[in-house]
């Protein structure tokens, strides 16, 4: 059975809820993989509380875990440590939200990084 997922916009949650209800869809959270969010426990709490306040079943929703620069196979133990920390934090966020599906990307997403890296090297 195919399912429809939408990425909820926190500044337009009513509209996101309308779509979910109208099309029997689910949320696909992409708030937490950003480094400035996953590094900030207060921001994480704020976002989680916003979603939990909707009082909806989240068990079929999907969460995108941290993936920026995650390298668990690095030769550098410090990189492995921060990668492990980000992965475990993503798991805890999923648990708090009641989400049973957690996606970790491979850190290689074509066209996602290119502009960022090019701008950083200027």
Question: Where do the language-model regions lie?
Answer:
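N-terminal pre-domain/capping segments
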Residues: 1-89, 95
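Active-site acidic/histidine proton-transfer and metal-coordination neighborhood
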Residues: 73-122
């Amino acid at each position: 059975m195919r399912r429809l997922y939408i990425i909820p916009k926190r500044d337009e949650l009513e509209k996101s809820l309308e779509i979910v209800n109208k099309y029997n869809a689910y949320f696909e959270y992409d708030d937490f993989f950003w480094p400035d969010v996953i590094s900030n426990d207060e921001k994480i709490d704020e976002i989680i509380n916003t979603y939990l306040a909707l009082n909806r079943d989240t068990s079929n929703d999907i969460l995108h875990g941290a993936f920026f620069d995650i390298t668990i196979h690095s030769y550098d133990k410090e990189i492995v440590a921060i990668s492990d920390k980000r992965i475990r934090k993503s798991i805890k966020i999923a648990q708090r939200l009641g989400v049973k599906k957690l996606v970790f990307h491979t850190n290689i997403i074509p066209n996602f990084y290119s502009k960022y890296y090019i701008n950083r090297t200027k």
